[in-house]
Regions:
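Flexible, low-complexity linker and terminal segments
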Residues: 1-9, 17-19, 206-298
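Active-site diphosphate/adenylate-binding microenvironment
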Residues: 5-74
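Short coil/turn connectors at secondary-structure junctions
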Residues: 19, 46-50, 88-94, 116-122, ...
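Thiamine diphosphate
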Residues: 54-132
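Glycine-rich beta-alpha junction loops
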Residues: 56-58, 128-130, 181, 204-210, ...
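Short, hinge-like loop/turn segments at secondary-structure boundaries
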Residues: 69-70, 114, 139-143, 192, ...
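Active-site-proximal loop->helix
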Residues: 108-113, 133-145, 165
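Conserved thiamine diphosphate
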Residues: 140-191
Length: 298
């Protein structure tokens, strides 16, 4: 009896014409993308209304590898670009998928204010602790004491704790998983996609060519063993207590899961108070182009 062929769960969402990809062997970004496509399949979202926005960096190439409406934007500007998409068409499910350097360093200001405003975005950040595409330089996420080309004697700056940053700025969903914990990561991404508001998922990922090699952390398999042995699942943990120390244990789990009005909800409330029945949201005006244009011209 011939066995049935088994493809990737998200095969229809991946662009095989873009192979081979740019990611190094043992890099975790492919695993993060795989989890994302499976989460999308499980979410039952209308894929014609899903948009993926990425910035610059290794993770930023995700936008070019998916069979979705996707946008590869300038460095650090993925979130403001995504915010514009969402405000122009509130019916879209907009996902920002990028790396720690793009989202938290170059785009840190945008990250803070999007979370503060509670813009209805799903933000997935692959954190590999360095600027991998440009040579592994120190980043705001590099743990204290870790070695990089720009800190050859060890990093002397304190690093950001991304869950603490997202939660303190107002995110309604905050989680951290690793590229080893794929089942939990898929479920977390699926939950984030279903949330209304700024939903943030951090994905801890190896950078075998630069960060792990320079810090003598072994092979990709060694990194997986480290994630198995040095991670603690603590759902509901205070985000202020989940900092990552070089060589220390890593707390993972879902830390924040709340509901509150989104930026669009607040806009609607304000405009209805000012204009009453004269206010009609652009996505509720029908598909007739002239009708939409008339609303924009008012």
């Amino acid at each position: 009896m011939n066995a049935e062929p088994h493809g990737h769960p998200g095969e229809a969402l991946l662009r095989s014409d873009r192979q081979p990809h740019i990611w190094c062997p043992e890099c975790g970004i492919g695993t993060a993308l795989s989890c994302f496509t499976e989460a999308l399949v499980r979410s039952k979202l209308d894929l014609d209304k899903v948009a993926v926005v990425s910035g610059i960096g290794c993770t930023g190439r995700v936008a070019g590898y998916v069979h979705l409406d996707s946008f590869h934007t300038t460095h650090g500007r993925a979130i403001p670009f995504a915010t514009g998409l969402k405000l122009a068409n509130p019916l879209l499910k907009v996902v920002v998928f990028s790396g720690d350097g793009d989202l938290i360093s170059i785009g840190g200001n945008h990250f803070i204010h999007a979370a503060r405003r509670n813009v209805d975005l799903t933000v997935i950040c692959v954190n590999n602790f360095n600027y991998a595409m440009t040579g592994g330089q120190v980043a705001p996420t590099t743990p204290l004491g870790a070695v990089s080309p720009t800190t050859p004697y060890g990093t002397f700056e304190n690093s950001f704790s991304l869950p603490a940053l997202a939660a303190s700025c107002g995110a309604v969903y905050v989680a951290r998983w690793t590229t080893l914990h794929v089942r939990q990561l898929i479920r977390s991404m699926e939950t984030a996609l279903a949330k209304r508001g700024f939903a943030f998922v951090e994905v801890i990922s190896p950078c075998p060519t630069l960060y792990t090699r320079r810090n003598k952390l072994g092979s990709g398999l060694d990194w997986m063993r480290m994630l198995r042995d040095k991670t603690d699942v603590k759902n509901g943990a205070d985000p202020r207590t989940v900092d990552i120390d070089f060589g220390g244990r890593i707390t993972i789990g879902t830390f924040v899961d709340i509901e509150k009005p989104t930026l669009q909800d607040k806009i609607d409330e304000s405009m209805k108070a000012a204009l009453g029945e004269a206010y009609t949201r652009i996505d509720q005006a029908g598909t007739d182009r002239s009708e939409r244009r008339a609303l924009l011209d008012q």
